[in-house]
Structures are given as structure tokens and as C-alpha cells.
């Protein structure tokens, strides 16, 4: 069992934290905004650990769902399940255990948060199968990756205001942007095996679609900043996020594999600077208030 532990860590992508961070940033945005910049530490711990566990569970389920496809893709052929180093039932068991631990984590929270967690679990569990049917599965991924937003508002305010759903929409656009960059890496392999991705759906307009999705995401955050009366610190973070998006254009415009993958990974910085702007606004507002 201990000898297989490194394989299990690879299965749930503990060696690749970028996915967890892409879930964490919008969740932190929601926690900070919902609590006016003063989220409780226990709540932060619950959502941070829950994000890590659910992303890990999602990776295990994704590898289970894609086990017959991944062996035909250069980037994924050596994954533990695809290469036969672990069995299918082990991946499912790990996903179930991690999801159960995540559910236990939220037991101290209110009923609305628990109810939303059931929806989140369904979306996360069904996402891996969307690539068979949905032309832009990355939009569904945006819901799965962003469902921490309404859950955060529910946990703090015991309600889910319109603002939370607007932030979720922004996250859907962002997910389509960065996961299309990711899909551009595997375009040739995905054509051969016949799965659906946004990179294939957008075709020769893929770069334009990515940039439009970034524009939509950051445009929504303009509305959020204006509506909430955010100050200069927020807008500095927003401007840095715009700079990140423009940098991504230079990476993806020629549609080469490694630069597209670099653009995907760089989204950690885009999410990070946007959150930093939100956190800095509340920090400075609190200091000014004192």
C-alpha cells in the first residue's frame, strides 16, 4: 500500500497544484467579498482544504472516465491509471473517499451550504463525461471550478445574492479561456480520438475566442468593482490581470503546444493578482477606517 502511495499522489495531481489554485482564487474572491474583507479563519481553512480535496477527487474521476482515451494522448499516456500502474476501482475509491472527507469538512456550516455542496458534487462528478456530448465542455468545467463562489456566500451570509451568480458567470468565461489554451495543446490527439473540446469547436477562431472570454471575465470584474465601490488597490490588481491576459495572447497566437501550455499555467498569476487587488482594497479600507 505504501509503495503505491506515490502513484496515488500522481493520480490526484498533488505534483501539479495549478488546478487547485485555479479553483482557489475565485473561491477566495467570494469569501473576501461576502465577508467584507474579514473571512473567519476556520471558514478559510474549510474552503481551502475542501478545494484541494475536491479538485483531487475530480482528477481521479477524470482519469477513470478518460482511461480509454488518455493512452492515445501524448501528454497523458503515462498517467498511473492509463499506464496500468493502478486499477480503475482504485481511482474510483480514492475519488469517493476524498469527496466524503470534503463533505465531512462542511458539516459545521449552515444548511444552505450543505445543499449547494450536493449540487457541486454532481457537477464535479459529471464533468469528465461532458467531453462526449457537449461541444464546449470547458463551460461546464467553469461551473464545477466556480461552485465554491455561491457556497462561500452561503457560508458567510446564509444566502446567495445575485453578485455570487455574476461572479460564477465570470468564472465560466475564465475557465473557457484557460482550458481552451489547455485544449490547444492536445488538439491533434483530440481530433484522432474523437472527443469534444472548445479548441476544436472554435476552430480557427480559437485565439479570438480565448481573448473574448478574457475580456468578458475582466469586463464583469469591472462591473463588480464599480458596483462595490472598490478603490485604487483593486483597480491595480485588475490592471495586472489585464496585462496577464494580453501576455497570454503573445503565447497562444501561433498555436504552438508548449507556449499554449505555458499560457494555461500562467493563469495562476491572473487569478492571484485579481484576488490580491480585492484583498488589498479591504485591507486598506480597514486601515483607513481605523
Swiss-Prot record:
The keyword Cell inner membrane applies. It comes from Burkholderia ambifaria (strain MC40-6). Belongs to the UbiA prenyltransferase family. Catalyzes the prenylation of para-hydroxybenzoate (PHB) with an all-trans polyprenyl group. Mediates the second step in the final reaction sequence of ubiquinone-8 (UQ-8) biosynthesis, which is the condensation of the polyisoprenoid side chain with PHB, generating the first membrane-bound Q intermediate 3-octaprenyl-4-hydroxybenzoate. Its cofactor is Mg(2+). This is 4-hydroxybenzoate octaprenyltransferase. GO terms for cellular component: plasma membrane. Disulfide bonds: none annotated. Keywords: Cell inner membrane, Cell membrane, Magnesium, Membrane, Transferase, Transmembrane, Transmembrane helix, Ubiquinone biosynthesis. GO terms for biological process: ubiquinone biosynthetic process. Pfam families: UbiA (PF01040). Pathway: Cofactor biosynthesis; ubiquinone biosynthesis.
Amino acid at each position: 500500500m505504501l509503495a503505491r502511495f506515490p502513484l496515488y499522489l500522481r493520480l490526484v495531481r498533488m505534483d501539479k497544484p495549478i488546478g487547485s489554485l485555479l479553483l482557489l482564487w475565485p473561491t477566495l474572491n467570494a469569501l473576501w467579498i461576502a465577508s467584507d474583507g474579514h473571512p473567519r479563519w476556520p471558514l478559510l481553512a474549510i474552503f481551502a482544504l475542501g478545494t484541494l480535496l475536491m479538485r483531487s477527487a475530480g482528477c481521479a474521476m477524470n482519469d477513470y472516465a478518460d482511461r480509454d482515451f488518455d493512452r492515445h494522448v501524448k501528454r497523458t499516456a503515462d498517467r498511473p491509471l492509463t499506464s496500468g500502474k493502478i486499477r480503475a476501482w482504485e481511482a474510483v475509491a480514492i475519488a469517493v473517499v476524498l469527496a466524503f472527507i470534503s463533505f465531512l469538512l462542511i458539516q459545521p456550516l449552515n444548511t444552505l451550504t450543505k445543499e449547494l455542496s450536493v449540487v457541486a458534487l454532481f457537477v464535479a462528478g459529471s464533468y469528465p463525461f461532458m467531453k462526449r456530448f457537449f461541444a464546449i465542455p470547458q463551460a461546464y468545467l467553469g461551473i464545477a471550478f466556480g461552485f465554491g463562489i455561491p457556497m462561500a456566500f452561503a457560508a458567510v451570509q446564509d444566502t446567495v445574492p445575485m453578485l455570487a451568480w455574476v461572479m460564477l458567470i465570470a468564472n465560466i468565461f475564465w475557465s473557457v479561456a484557460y482550458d481552451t489554451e489547455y485544449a490547444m495543446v492536445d488538439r491533434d490527439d483530440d481530433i484522432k480520438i474523437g472527443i469534444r473540446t472548445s479548441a476544436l469547436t472554435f476552430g480557427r477562431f480559437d485565439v479570438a475566442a480565448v481573448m473574448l472570454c478574457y475580456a468578458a471575465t475582466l469586463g464583469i470584474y469591472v462591473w463588480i468593482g464599480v458596483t462595490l465601490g472598490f478603490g485604487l488597490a483593486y483597480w491595480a490588481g485588475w490592471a495586472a490581470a489585464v496585462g496577464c491576459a494580453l501576455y497570454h495572447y503573445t503565447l497562444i497566437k501561433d498555436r504552438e503546444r508548449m507556449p499554449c501550455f505555458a499560457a494555461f499555467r500562467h493563469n495562476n498569476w491572473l487569478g492571484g493578482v485579481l484576488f490580491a487587488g480585492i484583498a488589498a482594497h479591504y485591507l486598506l479600507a480597514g486601515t483607513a477606517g481605523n
